[in-house]
Curated annotation (Swiss-Prot):
Protein's name in the database: Homeobox protein SEBOX
Lineage summary: Eukaryota, Metazoa, Chordata, Craniata, Vertebrata
DNA-binding region as annotated in the record: 19-78
Signal peptide limits: none
Disulfide-bonded cysteines: none
Annotated compartments: Nucleus
Length: 190
């Protein structure tokens, strides 16, 4: 009778019961959603993980691990000197639309918001370390209105919860904002 070690060796294993985990392959759509979320909220809360899992049709654990590995990749690249600590993307090889290259601070009075044209939310950079452009968490709802393709007018007509008296800044309400924007974008494209 063969021993368990012999049986696993016959299967091509190392003989010590090692089990190689199946590697997850993400679709382009899943990666786009994850990169967008990471660019806007690099430290998502549990409800954001749950929402991303639902949107991407991935298990929540896979979403959580993706964020952990994305951060590890950034730290590794910074330590090895591939990218400078101040930027995730080498300036000479990435091009973003002008409206997304110029920072817009909604608290600055008199500063006009970015152009009213539909902004592109994907980077044309081919570096895997360059996140898709998005909102920084401190921009909150004002920043979301600035990059929304419909502008600030009309958002409440599609989804009444989009217009609020106070800016949304907590991670829980940011998750709600992502969901609401997804609804508006889906309604707008149907």
């Amino acid at each position: 009778m063969p021993s368990p070690v012999d049986a696993s060796s016959a299967d091509g294993g190392s003989g010590l019961g090692s089990h190689r985990r199946k590697r997850t392959t993400f679709s382009k759509g899943q990666l786009l959603e994850l990169e967008r979320a990471f660019a806007a909220w690099p430290y998502p809360n549990i409800s954001t993980h749950e929402h991303l899992a639902w949107v991407t049709c991935l298990p929540e654990a896979k979403v959580q691990v993706w964020f952990q590995k994305r951060w590890a990749k950034i730290i590794k690249n910074r330590k090895s000197g591939i990218l400078s600590p101040g930027s995730e993307c080498p300036q000479s090889s990435c091009s973003l639309p002008d409206t997304l290259q110029q920072p817009w601070d909604p608290q600055m009075p008199g500063q006009p918001p970015p152009s009213s044209g539909t902004p592109q939310r994907t980077s044309v950079c081919r570096h895997s370390s360059c996140p898709a452009p998005g909102l920084s968490p401190r921009q909150g709802w004002e920043g979301a209105k600035a990059v929304a393709p419909w502008g600030s007018a009309g958002a409440s007509e599609v989804h009444p919860s989009l217009e609020r008296a106070t800016p949304q800044t907590s991670l829980g309400s940011l998750s709600d904002l992502i969901y609401a924007l997804a609804i508006v974008v889906n309604v707008d494209h149907s």
